[in-house]
Amino acid sequence: AKARAVGRTQDAEELAEAYEYQGIDTCAVDSMCVTVCPVGIDTGKFVKKLRSQRTGAKQEVTRAAWAGAAKAWPAVPTVASAALTGVNVLPTGLVQKVTDVARALVGEDIMPEYQPELGKGGKQRSSLGEHVGAPGEPIAVYVPACVNTMFGPSGSGVGATDAFVALAERAGVSLRVPKDIDALCCGTPWTSKGMKKGHAIMEKRVQASLMAATDHGRLPVLSDAS
């Protein structure tokens, strides 16, 4: 504002453009900064709001794409998992070139960048069944993170979901899994990008599902999301 006030329009435009990337695009929006801020400023929450206020044709396309992803969420993690497993056997350079072209065409917010470290995809959460852990009456509702469907364990590891289930078995506790677990997500992919419409769609679905699974709040909810 000061640069514009003194007629330095070009400087003002360069600063605004730089801030888009350095101040908004690269913010983790995890609100961890508030834990050490002496005056309790939550920059993550502020940046989420700024992202939701972006305008333009490209942004509208991105919002529509993320809203569509929320509606079709049972398929999205499954497709991502299958894609990762499939490309894992292809030459890394070829896959990276294809995703680079796709990112240039549809935008980096829609098409993620492929890295060979991603490994293979995971398995559907519904394969767990409606109960995990030890036999008996469930003491809580377990919501495995959808990220474990998209990304499988690294190397010879068992993955977060299988480790959580094994822990429940050893502890001798029974956990209930929502019937429509494949359609659920914590909402972070939408809130972190300021995609309010897509988040509202997912929020409504998760609330309805967990109200039923928890017996209207009687059971607590556990998740392996970090």
Regions found by a protein language model. Name each.
Residues 6-183, 190-226:
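Iron-sulfur-cluster electron-transfer modules
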Residues 1-3:
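Glycine-rich phosphate/ribose-binding loops and adjacent secondary-structure elements
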